[in-house]
Structure formats: structure tokens, C-alpha cells
A protein has these predicted regions:
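Acyl-donor-binding surface of acyltransferase catalytic domains
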Residues: 1-7, 112-210
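Short amphipathic alpha-helix that is part of the acyltransferase structural core
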Residues: 1-55, 61, 195-242
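Residue-level preference for long, well-ordered alpha-helices that form the structural scaffold
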Residues: 21-24, 104, 148-151
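Conserved donor-binding loop and adjoining core beta-sheet/short helix segment
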Residues: 32-144, 148, 264-284
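Short hydrophobic/aromatic beta-strand or adjacent loop that forms the aromatic wall/cage
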Residues: 64, 168-172, 258
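Short helix-capping and hinge/turn segments at secondary-structure transitions, especially at repeat
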Residues: 221-229, 253-256, 268-272
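Amphipathic alpha-helical hairpins
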Residues: 227, 241-260
Length: 284
């Protein structure tokens, strides 16, 4: 069997989905969705092109590089490198996503070499990545924190073979709506009310109301480093009104239905906690 040499080249990001140069971007999104379906066996991670496109438009806060991966005439995956402009800007975030039938052909290793070279060219000395690992039996890999583990699956073996180390496990949880689960949520809600006497709840849909922008920006900055990150190098993100505006614009332009809920401390009047709930067009 003859294996085609992979063709890995930068993708042109169109200004709109109707632009003549949008074909490769649309194919990238289609294949991206297939890749996540192959990983998890469901469509939970599926996103529409309109949702993804705003996040690849030029931004003063982050540069996003993306390559398409072809095997012959077939688009089989993508490779991406995110370059935040926060702090000392020493970290790059990498991703390699390939169709399952393109595994074990050296394509991923070739793509990784391109990403590492690009990271060095942009002055980055650390590459970090988040990889989805469905739960599976067999040999496991445990991070230094001792919390959680992942199966030694294809993606884990690839990362370890190339000198990367598992630093932290983040758990993905799913809540299926049912009478039982909603009763459980209602009970948690009552418990929370009993412990949250000094707070009010406020909520909004983008764009963020002017009176909440400063506190929302402060919370976004703090959560970038306050959230557990084990030994990973995380620079604090700098959020201000301009970045909140871009953040909101991405949600709005992508057509996502977003609800932001925040806790406001009654004594100070400041927002002190928040959560974001987003759903995509056509996703139940």
C-alpha cells in the first residue's frame, strides 16, 4: 500500500463564510467535527463554521496560526498554534487533530515539527496542549498532582514519545436532563441559597452591560491564574473593556446563545464569581 506524503500548509482565514477563499476553512471545520466524533463517539463538541470563524480573526490579544493537513486530495486534519500576548509571552498552545485513518503514518509527527518550529520562531520556550482522552480500561498515566488519570491511549503515547509530560487532568462532566437529575440540581440550589446570604445573583446576555464590564474583566483576569493549573506555566491574562468587547463580539457574531450569571457581594457591590453557559445554533 502506498502512503501519500502529507501536505501541511497554512490555512487562509476568510473574512466571511461566503468569501471565495472560504472553502478550505469550511472543510477544516467539517473535519474537525468528525475528529471529535471519532474521539468521543458523540456530537457534543460539534461547532458550526460561523461559531469558529470569529475566533480566527485578527486580534491584539492573541495570534492564532492554523495549518490544514492533506493526504493526497483528502483533508485529514488540522494543526494549530495559539500565541497569547499576555505577560512575558513564553508559552504557545498547540493542537493536532487528525482523522483516525490518518494515524500512525508519521503525519502527526510532521505536524508537530512544524508547530515546534513556529513556536521557536515566535520566541516561545514552552508548548502546552489540552487533549481529550475518553475513559478506558488498561494502563493509565497519572499526573504529578496525583489527581485523576488518563488511559495510555494513542494520543498519550504520541505525546510521551515526543518528550511531553502529563501535568494535569481536567474532568469533563455531562448532565443529562431528567426528573432525577433536576431534583438533584434543585437540592443543590437550596443548599447554595442557605450558604450565600451575603450575595445576589445577576445575569446577562452579551453584550455585557456597562455597569458589569470592569468587574467581569477583573474576574476573567483572575480566573486565568486562580483556576488550578498544577505545574503548567500560565501567564495572567490582561482583560479590560476592549477585550470584553471582543469576547462578546465573538459570541454574537458566532450566533451562540450565551448566558452569563454572576454573584454580586452585597457589602461591596462587586461581582466576585461567574459562570458562562453557551449553546450553539442547531444544537439541542
Amino acid at each position: 500500500m502506498t502512503t501519500a506524503t502529507p501536505d501541511i500548509r497554512p490555512l487562509t482565514i476568510p473574512s466571511s463564510l461566503n468569501a471565495p477563499e472560504a472553502a478550505d476553512f469550511l472543510e477544516m471545520v467539517r473535519v474537525r467535527n468528525i475528529v471529535y466524533d471519532e474521539i468521543s463517539g458523540n456530537r457534543d463538541e460539534e461547532l458550526e463554521p460561523a461559531v469558529i470563524l470569529p475566533h480566527y480573526q485578527p486580534s491584539p490579544f492573541e495570534q492564532r496560526l492554523i495549518w490544514g493537513v492533506w493526504s493526497g486530495d483528502e483533508f485529514v486534519g488540522r494543526a494549530g498554534l495559539d500565541l497569547p500576548h499576555d505577560g512575558d509571552a513564553t508559552v504557545a498552545y498547540a493542537q493536532i487533530e487528525l482523522r483516525r485513518h490518518a494515524w500512525s503514518r508519521g503525519i502527526g509527527s510532521t505536524a508537530l515539527g512544524i508547530l515546534e518550529a513556529a513556536a521557536r520562531a515566535h520566541g516561545r520556550r514552552v508548548i502546552e496542549s489540552w487533549i481529550e482522552h475518553p475513559t478506558a480500561a488498561g494502563e493509565q498515566v497519572t499526573p504529578p498532582t496525583g489527581y485523576g488519570q488518563i488511559p495510555l491511549d494513542h494520543a498519550a503515547r504520541f505525546a510521551l514519545r515526543h518528550g511531553y509530560a502529563l501535568e494535569q487532568v481536567e474532568r469533563k462532566s455531562i448532565l443529562n436532563f431528567s426528573a432525577t437529575s433536576m431534583a438533584f440540581v434543585a437540592d443543590l440550589h437550596q443548599q447554595a441559597l442557605g450558604a450565600a446570604g451575603g450575595y445576589d445573583v445577576v445575569s446577562w446576555h452579551p453584550p455585557t452591560p456597562r455597569e458589569f464590564v470592569a468587574d467581569y474583566a477583573w474576574m476573567k483576569s483572575r480566573m486565568s491564574v486562580d483556576a488550578p493549573s498544577a505545574g503548567m506555566e500560565i501567564a495572567e491574562e490582561s482583560w479590560d473593556a476592549a477585550r470584553i468587547l471582543e469576547h462578546d463580539t465573538h459570541w454574537i457574531d458566532g450566533g451562540r446563545d450565551v448566558l452569563v450569571v454572576a454573584a454580586r457581594d452585597r457589602a461591596s457591590g462587586r461581582l466576585v464569581a461567574f459562570t458562562e453557559l453557551a449553546s450553539s445554533p442547531g444544537t439541542p
